[in-house]
Amino acid sequence: VIYPGRFHPFHRGHMASYDWLTKKFGENNVYIATTNVQAPITSPFSYSDKVMMMTKLGVPASHIANVKNPYQSKEITSNLSDDEKSKTVLVFALSAKDAERFNFAPKKDGTPGYLQLLPVDRKGVQPMTKHGYIAITPTINFKINGVDANSASEIRRMYIKGNDHDKNQIIADLYGQPDPALRDILDKKLGITEQAQNYLKEARQLDAAKVVAWMQRVLILEQQANSITTDFAHLKPDYIDEKNYNR
């Protein structure tokens, strides 16, 4: 079971989903997949930053993987032998919000795509050489600094706007207690995010050529961070058994 995401930052809602998955599928079978791709506005945290956040909440470091594309996670599946792949069911875990972005339409010839929704009773599931499955995790509502916050972007916004006390409380609400190391990471990385946002707001008052050059660099980084494939419809992993693919 692979729980993919960018996690900027990894928060209590993500941890609740991870806990739900471990109870449903077993802790030894669940892995979190994320990347080291960074961009100043939407993806400020490095892979090591996210590992620190996850392990603070109790995720075993051995079950966190640095991958090129979380929604394929070949770095995880490639560790299995051909025999293991023919006997292992592959499940990607997504929130209902994320699942809405995916296209599960049949292939052009009308046959089912590789990925299917996981049956509730799990009856008739096929190994990863034939199909992969999507499990929808429940949405968990929680409060940060006394305010509803159920998305990473909302948490970033709250932290940037908060005062010193607010920031310590946000960290305590996210990770159980104030943490100097996490405070340092959030201050540095979200400080860059705040600076980037302010530059965009003040662009008219700055030298046009410098603004254009800076914005081009930012946009390139943002495009790279957001270019991760999120359409599973025609995914064709290299471990598919061609003879049995459509059966």
What name fits each language-model region?
Residues 28-30, 57, 62-65, 209-210, ...:
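Residue-level marker of intrinsically disordered, low-complexity segments enriched
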Residues 11, 72, 151, 207, ...:
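A diffuse structural propensity rather than consistent per-protein peaks
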Residues 1-201:
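Nucleotidyltransferase catalytic core that binds NTPs
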Residues 235, 244-247:
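Acidic, low-complexity, intrinsically disordered interaction modules
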